[in-house]
Amino acid sequence: MWDPLVHEFPETVHGFRCMLANKYLLAVESKYAPDTLGYELIRDCIGVVRSRNYEQATSRYRDIYTRLQGATEAELQQSVQERCCCPHCPRHKKADMGESAHVQKAHDVQAVQKP
């Protein structure tokens, strides 16, 4: 088990609570498969706890809370059908497949000689 006394200790009570919440969420995360809704929600909660910006964390927590309120325990264990494509989630980014679809490729034009 992780020992908080051996590792760097937070300076504030809030930091200590966040550290404990983070460790607890990491332990709960192992209960869910990586492709389930429960896993995504736990990872999002970890992101909220680790966030240093209060307004951003509050906004993200509201989103998580809304998603969690409508989910049953069985739904948390089910595989996620839609993948999240939000820009702030590195775990959802796919490998770059080359060029973007909206970028046109430049074509070489032969030199035109003047008459």
UniProtKB/Swiss-Prot annotation:
It holds the Pfam family Gemini_V2. One of its GO terms (biological process) is negative regulation of gene silencing by regulatory ncRNA. It is found in: Host cytoplasm, Host perinuclear region. InterPro entries: Gemini_V2, WCCH. Keywords: Host cytoplasm, Host-virus interaction, Inhibition of host innate immune response by virus, Suppressor of RNA silencing, Viral immunoevasion. GO terms for cellular component: host cell perinuclear region of cytoplasm. Its main location: host cell. Interacts with host SGS3. Through its interaction with host SGS3, acts as a suppressor of RNA-mediated gene silencing, also known as post-transcriptional gene silencing (PTGS), a mechanism of plant viral defense that limits the accumulation of viral RNAs. Belongs to the geminiviridae protein AV2/V2 family. This is Protein V2. It comes from Tomato leaf curl virus (strain Australia).
